[in-house]
């Protein structure tokens, strides 16, 4: 999503029943387009796994697991919360992005436009103009999940490849691979599509005593 390093995700995710029922016969790109076009708000849960290995035939291993929940309202408003094994929150109100690390009692603040762009967060929380920032390609079907591969058009992004998977129109997961060969896997569950969400749900107020760093 924005920056998947240290303790950050980049951070990063649902449409009317009739539209999503048709997704069972649709290709992955068509399902993705339906997701970004028709899902204006959503909330759900996620599990994030950091995967190592795979080079030169070495076995894959899970190096770390975290979990939490998310809420979003297109375009550009979201809350992405890590709850286990540590607490961290990424919040965006449509203009600014706030990254709050509870253990460090620190808030990092930056303009959202500079953070979204060609990041994986743009797929889940941005506008529906994915072709502007990504090259889309069908990624095939594995274990019943249809995958879309998205390659950022910009050359200065942290991620060289992003994949997003759907099962019969339902959002299932994302795979993020950075320029160093590290892979992050996200699986989604308990997704509620198009709930009514007030603007106040995305308003972030730094906790009392927290250090605020503006970038």
Swiss-Prot record:
Keywords: Chaperone, Periplasm, Protein transport, Signal, Transport. Gene3D superfamilies: Lipoprotein localisation LolA/LolB/LppX. HAMAP family: LolA. It holds the Pfam family LolA. The keyword Transcription does not apply. Its main location: periplasm. The keyword Oxidoreductase does not apply. It comes from Ralstonia nicotianae (strain ATCC BAA-1114 / GMI1000) (Ralstonia solanacearum). SUPFAM superfamilies: Prokaryotic lipoproteins and lipoprotein localization factors. Monomer. InterPro entries: LolA/LolB/LppX (IPR029046), OM_lipoprot_carrier_LolA-like (IPR004564), OM_lipoprot_carrier_LolA_Pbac (IPR018323). One of its GO terms (cellular component) is periplasmic space. GO terms for biological process: lipoprotein localization to outer membrane; lipoprotein transport. This is Outer-membrane lipoprotein carrier protein. It comes from the Bacteria. Belongs to the LolA family.
């Amino acid at each position: 999503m924005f920056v998947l390093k240290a303790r950050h995700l980049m951070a990063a995710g649902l449409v009317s029943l009739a539209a999503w029922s048709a997704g069972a016969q649709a290709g992955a790109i068509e399902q993705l387009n339906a997701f970004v076009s028709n899902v204006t708000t959503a909330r759900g849960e996620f599990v994030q796994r950091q995967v190592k290995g795979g080079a030169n035939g070495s076995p894959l291993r899970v190096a770390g697991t975290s979990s939490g929940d998310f809420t979003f309202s297109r375009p550009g408003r979201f809350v992405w919360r890590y709850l286990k094994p540590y607490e961290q929150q990424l919040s965006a109100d449509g203009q600014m992005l706030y990254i709050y690390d509870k253990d460090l009692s620190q808030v990092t603040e930056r303009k959202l436009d500079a953070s979204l762009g060609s990041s994986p967060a743009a797929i889940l929380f941005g506008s529906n103009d994915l072709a502007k920032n990504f090259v889309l390609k069908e990624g095939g079907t594995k274990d019943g999940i249809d995958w879309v591969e998205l390659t950022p058009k910009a050359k200065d992004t942290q991620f060289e490849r992003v994949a997003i998977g759907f099962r019969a129109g339902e959002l299932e997961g994302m795979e993020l691979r950075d320029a160093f060969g590290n892979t992050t896997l996200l699986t989604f569950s308990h997704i509620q599509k198009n709930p009514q969400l007030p603007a106040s749900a995305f308003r972030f107020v730094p906790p009392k005593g927290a250090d605020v760093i503006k970038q």
